[in-house]
């Protein structure tokens, strides 16, 4: 377990931003089957690996650490065992990383853009998610979702995605929560969670979206091994900071590089 020491005044400050929730199950409740048309599942090759987000008919955004040689993508899925009629399967045609490499750290450049081998069509359970027009503010209530384990004590992977609401927190909270990683003073990541614990993304949710006001703001990168632990939020790659890179790659400028 990660050991943390947070000053009392920092906790009080952040509790003023955080909003209490009635959801008590780590990872939240089963998502409405119609609220995640953009959510995709990455497989490697026979086991579920990560989540991802559909940007348009040909492009998916996820975390760089989810990359595997033989991965494939399922779109339009709700239940792993009861398929939707409009589910589609694709494989990567191309993969793009920051600086044309797979180099990333716990706090920077954990982002991968995947071009599908053929376009997908919008349908009842498939549609893209909007990229952000501005960054989220501290205190924003955001939605997380995925097929990751709903308990970190005993890994339990659901057949259907679970959703929960969490808050954007000041980056200082994550600096205090993970001192052993020596995070930089500033970062292109978002710190998000519930300070009181109880709700969080978890193993298997990596690469999935953080959605604030209907816009795609973050990609789950990493968090504490004990999901939903008090005062230990997760970190998400900040999508807004990578907009130029994303848009240039999609437009055909494959030499585009991420922000420094």
Curated annotation (Swiss-Prot):
Keywords: Disulfide bond, Glycoprotein, Hemostasis impairing toxin, Hydrolase, Protease, Secreted, Serine protease, Signal, Toxin, Zymogen
Tissue: Expressed by the venom gland.
Glycosylation sites: 103
Oligomer and partners: Monomer.
High-level lineage: Eukaryota, Metazoa, Chordata, Craniata, Vertebrata
Protein function: Snake venom serine protease that may act in the hemostasis system of the prey.
GO molecular function, one term: serine-type endopeptidase activity
Domain of life from the UniProt record: Eukaryota
CDD domains: Tryp_SPc
Stated name of the protein: Snake venom serine proteinase 4a
Organism this protein belongs to: Crotalus adamanteus (Eastern diamondback rattlesnake)
Propeptide: 19-24
Catalytic residues, chain numbering: 65 (charge relay system), 110 (charge relay system), 206 (charge relay system)
Signal peptide feature range: 1-18
């Amino acid at each position: 377990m990660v050991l943390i020491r947070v000053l009392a005044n920092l906790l009080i400050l952040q509790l003023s931003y955080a909003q209490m929730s009635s959801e008590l199950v780590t990872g939240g409740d089963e998502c409405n089957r119609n609220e995640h048309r953009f959510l995709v599942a990455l497989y490697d090759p026979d086991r579920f690996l990560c989540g991802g987000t559909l940007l348009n008919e040909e492009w998916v955004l996820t975390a760089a650490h989810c990359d595997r040689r033989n991965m494939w993508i399922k779109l339009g899925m709700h239940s792993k065992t009861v398929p939707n009629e409009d589910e589609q399967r694709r494989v990567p045609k191309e993969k793009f990383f920051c600086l044309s490499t797979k180099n990333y750290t716990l706090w920077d450049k954990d982002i991968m853009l995947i071009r599908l081998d053929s376009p997908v069509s919008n349908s009842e359970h498939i549609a893209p998610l909007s990229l952000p027009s501005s960054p989220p503010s501290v205190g924003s209530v955001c939605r997380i979702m995925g097929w990751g384990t709903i308990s970190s004590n005993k890994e339990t992977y659901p057949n259907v995605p679970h959703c929960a609401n969490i808050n954007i927190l000041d980056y200082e909270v994550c600096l205090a929560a993970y001192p052993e990683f020596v995070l930089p003073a500033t970062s292109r990541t978002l710190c998000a969670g519930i300070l009181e614990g109880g709700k969080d993304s978890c193993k298997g949710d990596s690469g999935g979206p953080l959605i604030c006001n209907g816009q795609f703001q973050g990609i789950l990168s990493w968090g504490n091994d004990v999901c939903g632990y008090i005062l230990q939020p997760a970190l998400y790659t900040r999508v807004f900071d990578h907009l130029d890179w994303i848009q240039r790659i999609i437009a055909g400028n494959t030499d585009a590089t991420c922000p420094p």
